[in-house]
């Protein structure tokens, strides 16, 4: 079964090493049958503690779809990439949104936010007299 995954990669901060490693990760994903690959560069940041003697790293988030049985082989291939400091692969869960619940919640918020003071000082609601009520019933 094809699942949607989201992976976060931490590379060494040097530009050339980063680009080579990122290309190697993409080739590995394509080799194991990943489709719909979307890559987002997060940025270069200082690390809280050194990882493999590196004080800075570049973060990249990649979303892709792939068969679940290929994940172990992909992880074993990622461990061999030299300039990849850390990685984390998560299953991205797609949830269906209940629109009825959202509509009800929005209506309640609208109802609660109505300015109640505008109704107090304005015109009063009049009850129909006897002759007016019979006119309504005839129609």
UniProtKB/Swiss-Prot annotation:
Domain of life: Bacteria
GO MF entries: rRNA binding; structural constituent of ribosome
Annotated GO biological process: translation
SUPFAM superfamilies recorded: Ribosomal protein S6 (SSF54995)
A cellular component term, taken from the record's GO annotations: ribonucleoprotein complex
Function as written in the Swiss-Prot or TrEMBL entry: Binds together with bS18 to 16S ribosomal RNA.
Protein name: Small ribosomal subunit protein bS6
Gene from which this protein is expressed: rpsF
């Amino acid at each position: 079964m094809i699942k949607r995954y989201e992976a976060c990669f931490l590379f060494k901060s040097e530009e050339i090493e980063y680009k080579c490693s990122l290309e190697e990760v993409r080739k590995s994903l394509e080799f194991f049958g990943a489709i719909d690959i979307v890559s987002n560069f997060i940025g270069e940041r200082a690390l809280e503690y050194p990882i493999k003697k590196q004080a800075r790293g570049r973060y990249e988030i990649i979303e892709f779809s792939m068969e679940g049985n290929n994940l172990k082989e992909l992880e074993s291939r990622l461990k061999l990439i030299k300039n990849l400091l850390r990685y984390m692969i998560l299953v991205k869960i797609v949830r269906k949104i209940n629109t009825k619940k959202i509509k009800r919640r929005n209506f309640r918020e609208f109802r609660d936010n109505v300015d109640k003071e505008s109704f107090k000082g304005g015109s009063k609601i009049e009850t129909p007299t006897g002759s007016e009520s019979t006119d309504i019933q005839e129609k």
